Curated annotation (Swiss-Prot):
Record's catalysed reaction(s): O-phospho-L-serine + 2-oxoglutarate = 3-phosphooxypyruvate + L-glutamate; 4-(phosphooxy)-L-threonine + 2-oxoglutarate = (R)-3-hydroxy-2-oxo-4-phosphooxybutanoate + L-glutamate
Entry's cofactor comment: Binds 1 pyridoxal phosphate per subunit.
Name the record gives this protein: Phosphoserine aminotransferase
BP term (GO), one: L-serine biosynthetic process
Role noted for this protein: Catalyzes the reversible conversion of 3-phosphohydroxypyruvate to phosphoserine and of 3-hydroxy-2-oxo-4-phosphonooxybutanoate to phosphohydroxythreonine.
One GO CC term on file: cytoplasm
InterPro entries (alphabetical): Aminotrans_V_dom, Pser_aminoTfrase, PyrdxlP-dep_Trfase, PyrdxlP-dep_Trfase_major, PyrdxlP-dep_Trfase_small
Pfam families per the UniProt record, alphabetical: Aminotran_5 (PF00266)
Taxonomic source organism: Ectopseudomonas mendocina (strain ymp) (Pseudomonas mendocina)
Predominant place of localization: cytoplasm
Amino acid sequence: MSKRAFNFCAGPAALPTAVLQRAQAEMLDWQGKGLSVMEMSHRSDEYVAIASQAEQDLRDLLAVPNDYKVLFLQGGASQQFAEIPLNLLPEDGVADYVETGIWSKKAIEEARRYGAINVAASAKSYDYFAIPGQNDWQLSKNAAYVHYCSNETIGGLQFDWVPQTGDIPLVVDMSSDILSRPIDVSQFGLIYAGAQKNIGPSGLVVVIVREDLLGRARSSCPTMLDYKISADNGSMYNTPATYSWYLSGLVFQWLKEQGGVEAMERINRAKKDLLYKAIDGSDFYSNPIAHNARSWMNVPFRLADEKLDKAFLAGADERGLLNLKGHRSVGGMRASIYNAVGLDAVEALVAYMAEFEKEHA
């Protein structure tokens, strides 16, 4: 096999090589059954065992309490932007949202289709370079829930704290930082995460929801979007994204083998420290995000002269450092350094950055 490139894509993102190799080995013949997982009936004993093991491994990794349901659904995180208010927001109620970037803004825009939304705080006043402290939030007294995005993949803005909302359910989009470090699931009413960053391939979204929040869907909520129906049917009301679920299960097993999310936190800290040190120690590269809001997973940076962007990307591609172009709405560069992107990838990137700066500064 030729050497695999270092993939810094924001999503669909890098998967652990060991996971891909195992999937390759099992592609035509899963554990002697003579067929691929993608050919299995989702009702078969074999697939039900695969799905159950994946759920248990995720529960183990995040220490999910027993009074939470873990759902493996379709539609990605973007579908959750509608599914959450349809399940949790009464027609005459209000929900609080915190806007810190493009993804939380999209969640707000979608939720407004279904009811009253109060934007309790916005990072717009900081040009999306910092997160407003909770003392500055304008929370509703009787909100159905409070929603925020823990890590904005495009802007590179991440909460390093968990909002405190008392008895009001806290809902969080963790699509891009779930499993990157330990969390206390009991602090949240609902956690959701699109799979294609830190969980597995696209086509899947994981929802972790406290049981007392089930059964609240509006009468107009489509059957397929009702959390209780999904929970009562083991995420198999219809045919699920079986292969994505299976591959995500392999990622969970790999994470356990690495030492779990505690080990991931140590590695991820080393990766982000190395990259930010290279950026901050240079007059050639810059990152404008407030230090206490810098993302561990998505690191945007700019070159001193944007006319050099194409040359930088071309040189990176030649060295197997792929997908470093920033989002079209932001520009510049972005290195997404999820769990499957090793420290060696960041070391190679930092070495190239130094080489490029020496040549062009």
